[in-house]
């Protein structure tokens, strides 16, 4: 890894109707699957800033925004395995927005096609959507919710990219900030920030549920988890 090629500082204030101020706060950055653009999810500004990546000169150029709803606090963006769809998780609204992604005249185009909730309406005041991942096959998207401490599984419709709920599981932990799906797609982990642990769950897609399995692993104030295959030399 070399030195820093470029740096961008987000400025301004988020839109607020409540007694709070939103300041720039980037929670997630992801390259588009074609690696032409960088998406910076700004939790405080209620938007995803899209930068063109100039690899030759090591520069980022702001060229577009995906504007979220007022006081929505976007938290994460993920792309479908075929690269045609983007999924944005909103922390304060407890929703996932689905976008069709394409490139036209060398410009990124994001077209919203679906909005779906991560929790029942009766829980919206005590819920904060926190984590989101897509399974290795691209067939399923999982979200975790803090406050109500739950995990939701959606099936991804192959032709449209749209989401259909499969099951919701109340997890035995506090603040499942992130989650990770096993490569076999039969299990997932929740990374729990407040209870300082990692729990494992077994999935039954046919009957629509998941069950806690094994013993938790204690970790002090965990924030992030990913599963990677280690290559043995």
Features from the language model and the residues they span:
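Asp-box/WD-like beta-propeller blade repeats and closely related beta-sheet repeat scaffolds
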Residues: 1-28
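Short loop/turn segments immediately following beta-strands, especially the blade-tip
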Residues: 1-3, 51-59, 99-109, 154-161, ...
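Surface loop/turn motifs at the tips and blade-to-blade linkers of beta-strand repeat domains
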Residues: 10, 19-23, 66-70, 121-124, ...
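Beta-rich catalytic cores
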Residues: 25, 73, 128, 147, ...
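Residue-level detector of Asp-centered blade-edge/turn motifs that repeat once per structural unit
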Residues: 33-34, 81-83, 136-137, 183-185, ...
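Short loop/turn segments immediately following the C-termini of beta-strands
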Residues: 43-44, 53, 91-92, 101, ...
């Amino acid at each position: 890894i070399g030195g820093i090629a470029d740096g961008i500082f987000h400025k301004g204030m988020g839109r607020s109707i409540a007694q709070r101020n939103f300041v720039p706060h980037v929670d997630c950055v992801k390259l588009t699957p074609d690696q032409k653009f960088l998406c910076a999810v700004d939790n405080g500004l209620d938007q995803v800033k899209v930068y063109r990546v100039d690899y030759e000169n090591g520069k980022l150029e702001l060229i577009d925004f995906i504007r979220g709803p007022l006081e929505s606090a976007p938290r994460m963006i993920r792309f479908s395995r075929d690269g045609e769809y983007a999924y944005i998780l909103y922390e304060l609204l407890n929703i996932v927005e689905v976008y069709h992604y394409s490139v036209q005249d060398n410009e990124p185009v994001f077209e919203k096609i679906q909005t779906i909730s991560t929790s029942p309406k009766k829980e919206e005041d005590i819920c904060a959507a926190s984590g989101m991942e897509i399974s290795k096959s691209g067939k399923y998207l999982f979200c975790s919710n803090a406050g109500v401490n739950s995990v939701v599984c959606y099936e991804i419709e192959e032709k449209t990219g749209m989401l259909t709920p499969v099951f919701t599981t109340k997890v035995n932990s506090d603040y499942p900030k992130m989650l990770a799906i096993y490569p076999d797609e039969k299990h997932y982990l929740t990374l729990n920030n407040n209870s300082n642990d990692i729990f494992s769950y077994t999935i039954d897609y046919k009957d629509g549920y998941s069950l806690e399995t094994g013993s938790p692993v204690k970790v002090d104030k965990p924030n992030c988890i990913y599963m990677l295959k280690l290559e043995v030399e």
